[in-house]
Amino acid sequence: MVIILLGVSIVVPGLFLATETPQTNTFEQTELERATLTGEVSTEVTQVTNQEQVNITVLNRRDGTIDSTGELQVGESANLTISGETITVEIIDVIDTDNVLVRYTYPLYVGWPSGAETIITNIADIIIMATAVMIIGAIYTGYKVSIK
């Protein structure tokens, strides 16, 4: 029974993680306001020029990785690399002199402790192994019950 519960405790969270990546977040951000995307990764609108061009910086506080978009206009996007992972930044709208509507698309595990990406990228293998553990546990439990 314990083996079956162990298998279920791995499969269910694994299914949730597999359906959650990549993440998309759209929100309004004020110039020089820092917002957390996920884990230790934060983003900041560093400059809004003439209500047209926007510069955004993304930082991983854990390892100090930093990348910047350069100047983007409304409708443009840029791919930034943080800790080896790609974060897509798209400017949706410049609302006024210092407010910007931005869409971020990123892997769920960016900024998580090391090893998280291994779990999420190999989730299919983990689910197969956990299912095998559950089946073996069910067979073993059925065998033990039938002996009594």
From Swiss-Prot:
Coiled coil: none annotated. Residues 19-118 are extracellular. Residues 1-18 form the signal peptide. Keywords: Host membrane, Membrane, Signal, Transmembrane, Transmembrane helix. The keyword Signal applies. It is a single-pass type I membrane protein. The keyword Transmembrane applies. The chain crosses the membrane at residues 119-139. It is found in: Host membrane. Residues 140-148 are cytoplasmic. This is Putative transmembrane protein ORF23.
